[in-house]
């Protein structure tokens, strides 16, 4: 950002008093790195720590940030404030050192709230679809020339980054309910895509607590703000009477204010009509597969319509939507000749979905777009607690594919829970009589295992939120060839 642009920004977003140097503990995460990127472009000195380099840290270094690949007390030297990821424990040496030095220690959402304080904030919350919906809204605003700032939990492909600093008053941000820290946000517009049981440890295992937290989040809106809510979701429908704010509903339901009709999927694109009260219908071509993405797009349309963005910009942004990282991410078609000597090719897709509802939506999108393909899924469960709490749902959803390979659970720092592991899940699915799942004890052998099961016209879906994305990229880089990917 040049001096003139920064001066324009400072006309409505003042500096944070004497804060000059901001340190991030766990800076390599997408959400943390995105905020750091925006602040770096605003002119703040940025430092941070994490355990290993990745794309996020590389981008920040290119912006002038100082990154430490360790956690040591001296890393916070000269910091004005320390921002902490939810993945970082309270006994981290940098946090201890900051508290001893009386340096403020805040959570990621508190810093995001500070970015939003003087801007027109659009916050996207919900159990599923936040990242994609955030990207769609950001793309529409950019298409309309509104130059928004955005902070997303995933890669926005059109921008090549998780976050971007714009010169306008608009800030579009993904709002994370996993630790209830989204309650720090005070947006002008709030989207809630759906509400399901997830991250229940935060809510003491009580679903009513989760619902009440979402209601509180919506009441952070000013009385003149706008809640955009998916009325197809039964939980959202149940809480609407408790939300004392202006509401726009959206969905396939007949009583939705912004309604989807005539949905059809052809390959990776969705075709549908959106009807709006007292406005012309929109015939949408969405460059993203699945009914779930039609819902995400309709949330974006509702927000854009509320802001008065012209239909031509809305339609162009959705037609040209490039997607987000690891959300039905097409990695290529690969010949089987060098994989197992067969003729033909297979399609490789990478997807982040790790909740049964998300996995189900991805499977349905794959079936609808490529009905003639056999679906081969490599699934990595994420967290033992989630596997335990949603065990039967996982068994039911995973039973829909044609070939299933299961890796060990990605623990994300959790201790193993008996009966909530991948081998148990394999046994349960096998007992249902349709599939004979393959347990992958060592992901280093995955290419050889795939070579033994793949045939022409298969769709290989690599699914999960842990390190399985790295496996997907390696499979693509080596074109699924065992001898290359397992050297």
Curated annotation (Swiss-Prot):
GO cellular component: cytoplasm
Localization terms from the record: Cytoplasm
Keywords: ATP-binding, Cell cycle, Cell division, Cell shape, Cell wall biogenesis/degradation, Cytoplasm, Ligase, Nucleotide-binding, Peptidoglycan synthesis
Pathway assigned to this chain's UniProt record: Cell wall biogenesis; peptidoglycan biosynthesis
SUPFAM superfamilies named among the record's database cross-references: MurCD N-terminal domain, MurD-like peptide ligases, catalytic domain, MurD-like peptide ligases, peptide-binding domain
Pfam families: Mur_ligase (PF01225), Mur_ligase_C (PF02875), Mur_ligase_M (PF08245)
Positions that bind ATP: 126-132
Gene Ontology biological process terms, A to Z: cell division; cell wall organization; peptidoglycan biosynthetic process; regulation of cell shape
Catalysed reactions listed for this entry: UDP-N-acetyl-alpha-D-muramate + L-alanine + ATP = UDP-N-acetyl-alpha-D-muramoyl-L-alanine + ADP + phosphate + H(+)
Molecular function as annotated in GO: ATP binding; UDP-N-acetylmuramate-L-alanine ligase activity
E.C. code: 6.3.2.8
Location, primary (coarse class): cytoplasm
Signal sequence region: none
Function as written in the Swiss-Prot or TrEMBL entry: Cell wall formation.
Family: Belongs to the MurCDEF family.
Entry protein name: UDP-N-acetylmuramate--L-alanine ligase
Species of the source: Proteus mirabilis (strain HI4320)
Lineage: Bacteria, Pseudomonadati, Pseudomonadota, Gammaproteobacteria, Enterobacterales
The encoding gene: murC
